Amino acid sequence: MRIERVDDTTVKLFITYGDIESRGFKREDLWTNRQRGEEFFWSMMEEINEEEDFVVEGPLWIQVHAFEKGVEVVISKSKNEEMMNMADDNMNNEFDRQLNELLEQSFEDENEESVQGNQQQRRSHASDHSKRARHTNGRLVIVKFEDLESVIDYAHHSNQPTDDFEDLLYMLNNEYYYAIHFDDNVGEEVINDFYSQLLEFTQPSDRSEMYLNDYAKIIMSHNVTAQVRRFFTDTEEI
């Protein structure tokens, strides 16, 4: 892990995915497992404090940027006097709230959309998809991946085109659901062929899109396979 002291109130660090795994964490822990994500963050803060004497004395502002090789994190102490004078319990609660919001984002700068911070937008977006699916009968496909490894396997070994549809990846009860909305100009034969190839990596979904919109969490959207390939290496190469 590389740590850079920006000024008295800000530090910046870069940690590779290999370093993350060497510390006993999986890279997906950072955005699918809140408890493990918090453990990882606090272990980093202890190391930063030891190397840079950067003591947490109030609310922190955190920015995360995901790259191909690892993650860059910028941590700043609040300069707001009102926040700095906050009671300890309230201060800790405020920090926990910020950290939880951070950990619920799906690499916000890479996806250009925060799942946590745009809950209303997400519901509107999902509603639009539902309406479209009702009006384009047969153009919606939903399948289920058993686990994240199956998602990664599909992303790295599928050669299906991605120009003729919009897609969403949901997570529900540690299972992953993949919804695909095909464009109007895509023929039924093409859709059926796509679905047949998809079933080599998945199984038919037992959940409707309406159910997923209400109870599941959207963790990726817009060319899901490309995002998965960017963040995760092929499991067969490990």
UniProtKB/Swiss-Prot annotation:
Name of one Pfam family that matches: MecA
Show the segment(s) annotated as Disordered: 108-133
Q: For this protein, what is any one GO molecular function term?
A: protein-macromolecule adaptor activity
Where does the source fall among the domains of life? Bacteria
Concerning its family, UniProt says: Belongs to the MecA family.
Describe its assembly.
Homodimer.
Function summary: Enables the recognition and targeting of unfolded and aggregated proteins to the ClpC protease or to other proteins involved in proteolysis.
Q: What's noted about domains in the record?
A: The N-terminal domain probably binds unfolded/aggregated proteins; the C-terminal domain interacts with ClpC.
Q: What is this protein called?
A: Adapter protein MecA
Organism field: Staphylococcus carnosus (strain TM300)
Q: Which gene encodes it?
A: mecA
